[in-house]
């Protein structure tokens, strides 16, 4: 099977325009970190649209480590991303499963933190994230995956807000690959 769309400069520009028009807001906001900001990025209107998810999935897949057996991320922002990337991988002829990391363990049954087809212990998993601010959400997902016996080396985000998250992720010994930084989204917003 072939990917329905190949990533290239035109598709990256199209995705940036979608983020600027549908995900970016300018005003006075309190972020999940508690910090105040004039910039707010909510990627869900893009990641939950068919066209947006298609663009995101293919671009993120290009950055998933070759030895990863799964992609995972903290619910809710990463849910469409992990599913989209796993599907894009299938179209590309690659086996890559999707895992969702709960914010809290399941309150009944297995009390699991992870949902999805679990790969063997010791497997490499790439973490997906919509927006990195402080890095806490990404690192929470990494921590739960490592506690379950998996290896995580890389986090892929849609947008790095450039507020210290990349530093915290690097300090934890992980790579961060971001499709865009906040400055790029803001510049596109101003010029669209």
Swiss-Prot record:
Substrates-to-products reaction catalysed: orotidine 5'-phosphate + diphosphate = orotate + 5-phospho-alpha-D-ribose 1-diphosphate
Keyword Glycosyltransferase set for record: yes
Broad class of enzyme this protein falls into: transferase
Protein's pathway: Pyrimidine metabolism; UMP biosynthesis via de novo pathway; UMP from orotate: step 1/2
GO molecular function: magnesium ion binding; orotate phosphoribosyltransferase activity
Classification via Gene3D superfamilies: 3.40.50.2020
InterPro entries: OPRT, Or_phspho_trans_dom, PRibTrfase_dom, PRTase-like
Cofactor needs: Mg(2+)
Keywords: Glycosyltransferase, Magnesium, Pyrimidine biosynthesis, Transferase
Signal peptide range in chain numbering: none
GO biological processes: 'de novo' UMP biosynthetic process; pyrimidine nucleobase biosynthetic process
Enzyme Commission numbers on file: 2.4.2.10
CDD domains recorded: PRTases_typeI
HAMAP family linked to this entry: PyrE (MF_01208)
Assembly information from the UniProt record: Homodimer.
Stated role: Catalyzes the transfer of a ribosyl phosphate group from 5-phosphoribose 1-diphosphate to orotate, leading to the formation of orotidine monophosphate (OMP).
PANTHER family: OROTATE PHOSPHORIBOSYLTRANSFERASE, URIDINE 5'-MONOPHOSPHATE SYNTHASE
Protein family membership: Belongs to the purine/pyrimidine phosphoribosyltransferase family. PyrE subfamily.
Protein name: Orotate phosphoribosyltransferase
Organism, as annotated: Prochlorococcus marinus (strain SARG / CCMP1375 / SS120)
The organism's taxonomic lineage, starting at the top: Bacteria, Bacillati, Cyanobacteriota, Cyanophyceae, Synechococcales
């Amino acid at each position: 099977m072939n990917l329905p769309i190949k990533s290239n400069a035109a598709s990256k520009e199209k995705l940036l325009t979608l983020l600027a028009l549908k995900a970016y807001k300018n005003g006075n906001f309190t972020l999940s970190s508690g910090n105040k900001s004039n910039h707010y990025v909510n990627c869900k209107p893009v990641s939950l649209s068919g066209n947006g998810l298609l663009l995101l999935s293919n671009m993120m897949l290009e950055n998933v480590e070759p030895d990863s057996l799964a992609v995972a991320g903290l619910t809710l922002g990463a849910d469409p991303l992990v599913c989209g990337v796993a599907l894009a991988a299938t179209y590309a002829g690659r086996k890559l499963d999707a895992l969702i990391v709960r914010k809290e363990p399941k309150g009944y049954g297995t009390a699991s933190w992870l949902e999805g087809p679990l790969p063997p212990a010791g497997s490499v998993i790439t973490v997906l994230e919509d927006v990195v601010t402080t890095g806490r959400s990404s690192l929470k997902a990494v921590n739960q995956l490592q506690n379950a016996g998996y290896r995580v080396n890389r986090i892929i985000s849609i947008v790095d807000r450039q507020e210290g998250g990349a530093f915290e992720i690097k300090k934890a010994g992980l790579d961060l690959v971001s499709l865009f930084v906040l400055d790029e989204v803001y510049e596109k917003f101003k010029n669209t």
